[in-house]
Structure formats: structure tokens, C-alpha cells
């Protein structure tokens, strides 16, 4: 006989097969009987195309000896890209570079720590810095500066992809580390993060909430679509086969990108095998021979395009993404925000513990903190964002584009995201010296010096 329990407003529960079941009785809130609206059908329809949480089960793992909860709260600005044009930038095509209003926000502890960097007179808000952060000093050698930071390097153009969302974010961390600025004035590495956590490990990711609002119009129709995905289920495309051919994360297309017949083989695939994010080569109508005669030809120039691919507006919409309309196209209210909530580890295997510092490591170095030893940069969830427009390039599939421009004294954000995240660290070690130093008292048994 199943145990039963009653709750207010006619809710009825029964305990069987190890858990409580809601019997879903009709509501008793109103005078007349109303059947419950079948809202789950709409959710089931969306999950048939994309399920952000395919399911999980709990694994019986030992609870930590002690825990510490870490909270993050802040804002992320999704801005348009900037460029510092030089003669050597993209082979002289710096004036013809275009970007798309896309973004990718990864939920991992590493990028949340980078988003809560120190705020100094040289802030990380506004994009990449020309060099590593300089707290004080103006000498050319690193050893002559405090705290031993490098000056901006010459002949380098600062750049970053839209996946580096933490560069345009302001995040607060609780509890705070009062010695973080003096210990890590520069951008923290995995080695620095491992030293800051010490013996703590990531026990679980509790919850992360996103609230996205479109802030800029792009014509008469420009909603911002956002979709939350589990882990790296929809990650960028990467070919290690051509790893030596896409330095600086840029590549050049070759024929037959435009559908023509090439007279030589290239490293690109035919048109039927290209994914939609790859742009076609712009055609060249006229050319000049060695004798100075201008002739017409059937050739095409090589288009520069980024190796990092993102979800287009049409793709996100087809997968059931939410839309947020900018002010002017819809009145601003709570419904103007896209709300996303990520709970748990986002892992169908139910794994809870994650290694921040490899076990048995006395001196934390970069070699120990590299993958797969450390899981600081393990992605639990990923939020994909793209803004649509009624006028776009065909291979962008409704995604808004813009021309890269020189930096000005203000940034141009097309969306803002409010973030709240809760993490929990754990420690398995018992705080007893006779347990930790057991080997020191027993290593000489039977052979005392």
C-alpha cells in the first residue's frame, strides 16, 4: 500500500518506487472546475529538436569533509568587434573585414574566475588589452617592474573571439580574496588558479541563471536568440588536420568555393561538403596581364574568415531558442528578457567531483595543470547567442553583420546578460595531523637509525 500525503489546494502525492509521485489532480483553486493547461506539450515539442538536459542520475560518491560555497554575480556586455588596422593585418584586407553579432558563453569555473579579475585603472572591460596588465612600472625588462609584468609588445594587434565573453564582463565573487591582487595582478593562469584553491576540489555546480536583453536595433526586425546547451554538445568545428594552416585562427578559402571549376586541387572541400558558416569567395571580374592589358576572367579572390564558428540566428531558432526584442520593437518588461537556468553538472553520467589540482602534486606547475589533469576549464553548459535581421548575407542565415571599425572611446553593445552562479567546493582530507602525516611516523619501523 502506497503511502499518501495531502497538500494545500488539493495536491495529492503518493510514495512508491522510492520517490514521491504527484497524482496531478484537478485544481481546486477556483469555484468552478478548470482542467490544467497542457503546457508540457509545448516543452515536449521543443525538446524533440534540442534537449538542453538529456537526463542525469545521481552517483553515490563520498560527501566532502568540509565545503565552501562560491557565488558569482555580474553583467556581460555582448559588444561588436574592433580592429587596429595595420599593413600586415590580414594581408592588407583590414578595411574589408566583417563580423557577425554572435556570442558563446561557456559555464566553467575558469572563465568565471577570469570574469572577476581585478579592476584597476586599466580595466579589462572594453575588450582585449594590447599587453598583459601592468600594475606599476615603465621599464622594458620584466624584472625591473613591479610586480614583474611585461610591457605591451610591439607589432602586435590585440584581438579576441566572441567566445572570450569574460573580457567584456564585470563579475563579483563571494567570498572575496583580499590577497588576490597582490598575488595575481595579471591575468590568472591555470597554475595561479590551482595555487589559489590549494587543496579544494570542485564538488558540484549548483546553479547558474542567465537573463539576456537585446539592446540595439538592426532594422525593423532584430531579435536576439539564445539557446542553452549541455556541455560542449554544440561546440565550434576544429580540424587538427590543418592545424598548421590556420595560424591566428584565420584561414583563406580556395576554389571551388564559388562553384567554379578549379585547375588545381586545394585544401578546401567541394561545395556540397562545406558547412554554412564558410563564406564564398568574392569574384574578380577584371584583371591585368603582364603587358598591362586589362582582361575579363573567371577567377575569385581568397576570402578571410574566422576559424571559430558559432550558431547562426536561423539555427538557434530552428532548435527552439528564445527571442528577446530590443527596446523600440517591444515594450521593456520582464518578458523582454530571455531566462535560462542551468542546474547540476550537465553530465548524464552524474559525476559530481571534478579535479582542480591533480592529486599527489606538491609543486603546482603548468604541466600538472594541463588537460586532462585539471578540470578547471570543464564546460558544464554553453549559452549560444545570435542577433537576427531581415537583411543578411545568405550564408549567415539571418544573422546580423557589421563592418569592423577602429576603436573609439565607447563600446557598442548589442545585448547584455545578467548572470548569477553558485558553485560548491569540497575537501576530502580530514584536518588531523596524525592522519595526514601518518607516513612520517611509520617509515622507519624496524630500522631506526
Curated annotation (Swiss-Prot):
GO CC annotation terms, alphabetical: host cell; host cell nucleus; T=1 icosahedral viral capsid
Inducing factors: VP1 and VP2 are detected 12 hours post infection, while VP3 only after 24 hours.
Pfam families (UniProt xref): Gyro_capsid
Ranges where the record places region Nuclear localization signals: 6-47
Region (DNA-binding), start-end ranges: 1-43
Any one of the GO BP annotations: endocytosis involved in viral entry into host cell
GO MF annotation list: DNA binding
Swiss-Prot/TrEMBL keywords: Capsid protein, DNA-binding, Host nucleus, Host-virus interaction, Late protein, T=1 icosahedral capsid protein, Viral attachment to host cell, Viral penetration into host cytoplasm, Viral penetration into host nucleus, Virion, Virus endocytosis by host, Virus entry into host cell
Subcellular localization, as worded in the UniProt entry: Host nucleus; Virion
Subunit structure: Homomultimer (Potential). Interacts with Rep; this interaction relocates Rep into the nucleus.
Function: Self-assembles to form the virion icosahedral capsid with a T=1 symmetry. This very small capsid (25 nm in diameter) allows the virus to be very stable in the environment and resistant to some disinfectants, including detergents. Essential for the initial attachment to host receptors. After attachment, the virus is endocytosed and traffics to the nucleus. The capsid protein binds and transports the viral genome and Rep across the nuclear envelope.
Protein family per UniProt: Belongs to the gyrovirus capsid protein family.
Protein name as it appears in the record: Capsid protein
Protein species of origin: Chicken anemia virus (isolate USA CIA-1) (CAV)
Phylogenetic classification of the source organism: Viruses, Viruses incertae sedis, Anelloviridae, Gyrovirus, Gyrovirus chickenanemia
